[in-house]
Curated annotation (Swiss-Prot):
It comes from Mus musculus (Mouse). The gene is Dact2. GO terms for cellular component: mitochondrion. One of its GO terms (biological process) is negative regulation of cell adhesion. Keywords: Coiled coil, Developmental protein, Phosphoprotein. This is Dapper homolog 2. Residues 505-516, 631-644, 664-673 have a biased composition (Basic and acidic residues). It comes from the Eukaryota.
Amino acid sequence: MWAPSGQGPAGWDRRRVGARLRAALAGLQELQGLRATQQARVRGALGLHPAPGPRGQELRLEAALTALREQLSRLRRQDAGLKTHLDQLDQQISELQLDVSRSSCEALDSDSRPSSGFYELSDAGSCSLSTSCASVCSDRLSPSLGSWLPVFQPSKSRSGIGDWRPRSADETTVPAWSPQLTEDSRLLHGAEGTGRLTGMFRPRPVSTGDLERVLPADVGLQRAGTDAAHLLGQGIEIPAHALDPTYQRDLVARGGQEVYPYPSPLHAVALQSPLFALPKEAPCFDICSPPQEPPLVPVDENRTQPEPIRELGSAEAYIHRLLHLRGQELPLRDVGQEQGGDTAAFPPKPCGQRSESTCQLEKQACGADRGGLKLGRGAAKDSLKQHGPVSLVGAEPLSSPLKEETIPWNPCVHGDNTVGSSPCSQAQQPLNDCGQGPVLSPSRVLGTESPPLAPEPFAYTSCTTGETSPVKLRMGFSQNKAVKVRRRVSEKVPRLGKQLPPQPERQRVTERDPSRPHQGGLSRRPTLAREPPGRSCSESTLYPVPFLVPVVVAQRESYPTSPQAFFPMEAALLSSAARRKQRRWQSTMEISAKAGSVSQPGPSMGLPRSPAKRGSGPRAQSRPTLARQDACARCESDPSEHSADCTSLYHSTIAETSEDEEASDHTANRFGDESSSNDSEGCFRGSRRRLAIGSAEAGQGGWAWPRVPPQQPSRAPGNTRPPLPPVPKLCRIKASKALKKKIRRFQPAALKVMTMV
C-alpha cells in the first residue's frame, strides 16, 4: 500500500501526503454512502405516509381566499346605494353630450390611473365631476367594467378571476351597459389564460388583488408540494463504492476516551482531516512527531506493527540521545529491540485498543522523566546534607518568621524534635553541620548568581505542622534567650563610640552564630537579617545595588513569606525613591552627627549603664513604648552608603538626644507613661533590653506583644554594622537634635504626621 520512496524527510512527506489523500478518498466515499442510506430512509418514511402536510397547507390557503372573497362581496353589497347614485350622475353626464372619446384618450395617454381625471382641467379651465367621470368612461371597453363581472355574472367567476381585484372608488362608478357587458364577456373568454384584455389599454400594476392572477388557482400549491416530495425522494443515485477495508473499523482516540464508530460522519471527517494520516496497517494517527503521527487505533487492530516503529527508529534514537545528554536515562530496551518490533512486552492500555508507536515511547519517556525528577530530588536532598549551611542561609530568612519573642520560628529550619515529619528529620542534619562551621561561609559558595533558596519542599511544608503547638515550643528556651540578648548588648554597645573597624564585628557575628541552632529557642534572632541572602558583606559593598531582606512582622496563625523575600531586586527597585529621600536626610544627619561627636563624645560610652537601674520592669511593654523604640531603631537601621565611622557618629548623636531628653519630664506625661523617658535615654540598648524582658514574660505568661499588621520590609544596608533586632515599625524620626526636641513636644499623632514626611 505504501508507494516506494527513498529514506529521509522527502520520503516521509510523500508517504504522509499519500496516506492523507487515501484517507480523504475513503472519508468522501463514506459520506456518500451515508447520504445514500439517509435518502433511502427518507423515501421509506415518505412512502408510508402519503404527504398530508402540503395538502393541508393548500386547504388552509383556499379557505382563507374564500373568506376574502365573501368579505369583498359583502362590502360591494353595502355600497349598492352609492352605485345607484353614481349611475344617476352618469346619466346626467350623457345628457350633456360631452366629447367622451377625446377626453378618455387624453386621460389614458397622460396617466393610466383612473383617478387622474379629478385634477384634469378641461372646458376653459373648469374642473367638474363630469370631467373625472369622462376620463374613465369610454365607448370602448374599459378595464373597470370587468370588476363587476362576478356580481352580475356569478357563473363566470372563475373565468373573470384575473380582473376581480379591489378597485378605487371612482373606478366602480361606471354604469354597466348591456352591449359592453357582452363584449366584455366575449373578450374575457378569449383572453382568460393571460388575464389581459385585447385592446389598447395598458394593464394596472400588480396589487393585492392580483394574487390569483399570478399564482395558478388549481395547480400551484399542489404542484409545489409534489415537486418538493419529488426532489426530496429523487436524490443523486450514487453507486456504493467498494471502500478500503482498512478504513472500515472504529477509531479510538489516543487517550482511549473518544471512539468514532465506522459508519458515521465523525469517522469520515476524522479520516480526511489533515490532523490524521494512515500508515500501512493502523487506520489513524495523531500528530506526535514530524515524520509520522501517532494513532487513533481500530478496535480489532493487531498490536505488533513493525513498519511504523522501524520508520521512527531515528526519531526515538534522537529522543534517547537528548535524554541521555540531560542525565536522565530511560528504563527501556536498546534501540535495536525497539526498532525490531518486539513491542508486545509493553503493557497495553486497559481499553485494549492501543497500538505501539512513538506516543507510548514518549509516555514512557515522560514516566522516566518523572522518575529522574524523583531521583534528582533525592540527590538534591543528599547534596543538601553535604552542604547544610547553604540551605540554612538561603531558606532561613524566608521560611522562619522574623518577629522576635512573639511567633515560633520554623521548626524545619531549626531541627526541632517536637515535629516528627520526615522533611524536618531531613533538615536536622544540615543544622548539625551548621554548628560545626561558620554560617557566613556559604554566602561565598552561593555567590551573586544564587537567589534566596526556597524550592525544596521541606523548606516550608512542615511550617503548618509547627503551627499546632506554638506556645509549647515558645516556652522551652525563653529564659536562655533573654540572658543571651543581655550579654550581646553589653558586648556590642561600647564598640559604637570606639569606631572599631568592621572586621571584628564580622568575626563576632561568625563566632556567635554556630551555637544558636543547638539552643533551640523559638525567639531566635536572625543574625543575617541585615544582609541580603546569599551575599557577604564584602559583596554588598562591591555591588552598589542594595538588596532588601524581608523583616516580616508575621501574624500568629500563619507564616506568610512576603514576595519581596523571593525577589529582593524588585523590592529594591520599588523603594529606590524612598532611599533617595533617606540619603538626603542622612546627609543632614551626618553633618549634625559630626558636630555632636566633636563636642560631646562621652555620653555614648556611659550610656549602657544608665538603663540598668531603671526601665527593667514589665511596664516597658506598653504601646507608646513601642513607638519610641521604633523611632530609635528605625534611625539606627536606616540603609546608608556611608562607612561604619559615620554610622557610629550618627548613633552618638541619637545618644545625645536621648540623654538631653532625660531632663524633660513633661515628655513622658505627654506620651502617657513613665517609661518613655527611660526608653529615650538608651534608644538601641533599651529596646534590646526590653526585647529580652518581653521574651521572659512571654515564656511565662503567653503572648506579650500586641498584634501588629505586617509592614514593609526594612532595607538591607551596604555597610558592615552588626545586625539589629527587627521591631514593630510605627513611625520614623529623621531630624537633628534641636528639631527632635521640638517635634517631641507635640502629641503622638502630630509626631506621626510630621515624621512621615
